[in-house]
């Protein structure tokens, strides 16, 4: 057997996709393959694609075309491979393999088969696989932070969303498995663990018969990691038990990522959101009272088919009233294969864009005000990078999640991957600026 080929991975899409990328890297390294970050030097490039909305697919296609033009042997993995396997093979002769979301753990045998000249298609119709703490993993995040998947797939069928088709139904890992992986991450020096799944508040429902997020948080609270953050918490799943676990577990950050999508009950019904009209003022106020100082992030979809100006105004007033810390806004993307694709009264893109801009313009002064409230405080900051030109450190406080929220720009010296006290001296609508607090 000659020398094994070198492999690069181009990662696109969400942090769930990132974990798949990290497991593929871990499996390849364990099998003796060279992994290179430089795609030009690699024999094979694995493109872990995203297919969530049109813009994500366009980015995936651009990447694939660029690599094809460079005559690279391409292995297509991820959601787009799951979604469009036949078209991809037809249109990209450079693709030596297409691997679905439930099959990436077989990546080593895929490369071996491709090396023998086979064109490999490995796409399970219904993905059922989920990696655990025994699956090799090679992290690609900054050294202080790691994502930890507690479950994969989704049992809900929201009208606009194709994820259940791409990722399968929910399958949770056991509490023991998650704790074991968390301990491995802490041993690697991780300071912040971010729990992810499609619906984190439904964690455990499929294997325990009821959600077990509160028990999971308490179990993770016994691990020596400074920060545990949750993403994708449905407000209706934030039960008194879960809220108590957040309050009583010191290393669980009071950061709630609530994918609300809209405020108007009729729009929520059209979206087939699981709580229908129960997203209301009471739920948000209850959370604020139960967890004082909670940082609230949410996302909204504007321009859902049939959304009236009055319904959009309802959303504007809702955002104005509740003053979320962070808001992400997407315009509706009609996805073939979803019920919303065929709904009447699809809105023109310019109307959707204008509504997105109005909502973001409303949120900006709120975000600015929230950040101004941090000025003068000394806050804990996880230092993640150093700007090579200015020497400034860049990190995040507990208010900010990676990639989606702001950052803290810090003067002073500190070791990367550590959490240090920083005195905040100024802020804009996105970021904070501060100085390392010396211990003299």
UniProtKB/Swiss-Prot annotation:
[4Fe-4S] cluster 1 binds at residues 14, 50, 79. Binds 2 [4Fe-4S] clusters. One cluster is coordinated with 3 cysteines and an exchangeable S-adenosyl-L-methionine. Keywords: 4Fe-4S, Cytoplasm, Iron, Iron-sulfur, Metal-binding, S-adenosyl-L-methionine, Transferase. Residues 140-370 form the Radical SAM core domain. It comes from the Bacteria. Pfam families: Radical_SAM, TRAM_2, UPF0004. One of its GO terms (molecular function) is aspartic acid methylthiotransferase activity. Residues 5-116 form the MTTase N-terminal domain. One of its GO terms (biological process) is tRNA modification. PROSITE patterns: MTTASE_N (PS51449), MTTASE_RADICAL (PS01278), RADICAL_SAM (PS51918), TRAM (PS50926). Gene3D superfamilies: Methylthiotransferase, N-terminal domain, Nucleic acid-binding proteins, tm_1862 like domain. SMART domains: Elp3. Residues 372-438 form the TRAM domain. Its cofactor is [4Fe-4S] cluster. Belongs to the methylthiotransferase family. RimO subfamily. This is Ribosomal protein uS12 methylthiotransferase RimO. It comes from Nostoc sp. (strain PCC 7120 / SAG 25.82 / UTEX 2576).
């Amino acid at each position: 057997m000659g020398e094994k080929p070198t492999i690069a991975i181009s990662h696109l899409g969400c942090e769930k996709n990132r974990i798949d990328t990290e497991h593929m890297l871990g499996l390849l390294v364990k099998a003796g393959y060279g992994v290179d970050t430089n795609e030009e030097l690699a024999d094979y490039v694995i493109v872990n694609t995203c297919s969530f909305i049109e813009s994500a697919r366009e980015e995936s296609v651009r990447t694939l075309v660029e690599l094809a033009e460079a005559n690279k042997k391409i292995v297509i993995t991820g959601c787009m491979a799951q979604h469009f396997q036949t078209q991809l093979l037809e249109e990209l002769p450079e693709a030596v393999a297409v691997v679905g979301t439930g099959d990436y753990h077989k990546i080593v045998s895929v490369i071996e088969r491709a090396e023998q000249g086979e064109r490999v298609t490995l796409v399970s119709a219904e993905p059922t696989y989920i990696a655990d703490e025994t699956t090799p993993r090679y992290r690609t995040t900054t050294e202080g932070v790691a994502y930890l998947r507690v479950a994969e797939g989704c049992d809900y069928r929201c009208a606009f969303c194709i994820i259940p088709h791409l990722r399968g139904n929910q399958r949770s890992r056991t509490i023991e498995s998650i704790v074991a992986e968390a301990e491995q991450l802490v041993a690697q020096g991780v300071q912040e663990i971010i729990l992810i799944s499609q619906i984190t508040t439904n964690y455990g429902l499929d294997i325990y018969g009821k959600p077990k997020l509160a028990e999971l948080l308490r179990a993770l609270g016994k691990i020596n990691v400074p920060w545990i953050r949750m993403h994708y918490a449905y407000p209706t799943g934030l039960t008194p038990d879960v809220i108590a676990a957040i309050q009583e577990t010191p290393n669980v950050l009071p950061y709630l990522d609530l994918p609300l999508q809209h405020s108007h009950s009729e729009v929520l019904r059209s979206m087939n959101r699981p709580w229908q009209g129960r997203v209301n003022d009471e739920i948000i106020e209850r959370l604020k009272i139960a967890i004082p100082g909670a940082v609230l992030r949410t996302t909204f979809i504007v321009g859902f088919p049939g959304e009236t100006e009055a319904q959009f105004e309802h959303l504007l007033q809702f955002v104005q009233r509740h003053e979320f810390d962070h808001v992400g806004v997407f315009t509706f993307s009609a996805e073939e294969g979803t019920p919303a694709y065929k709904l009447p009264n699809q809105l023109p893109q310019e109307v959707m864009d204008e509504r997105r801009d109005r909502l973001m313009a409303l949120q900006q002064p709120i975000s600015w005000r929230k950040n101004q409230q941090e000025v003068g405080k000394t806050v804990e900051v996880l230092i993640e990078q150093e700007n090579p030109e200015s020497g400034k450190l860049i990190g995040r406080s507990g208010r900010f999640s990676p990639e989606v929220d702001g950052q803290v720009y810090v003067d002073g010296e500190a070791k990367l991957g550590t959490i240090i006290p920083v005195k905040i001296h100024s802020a804009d609508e996105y970021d904070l600026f501060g100085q390392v607090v010396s211990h003299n």
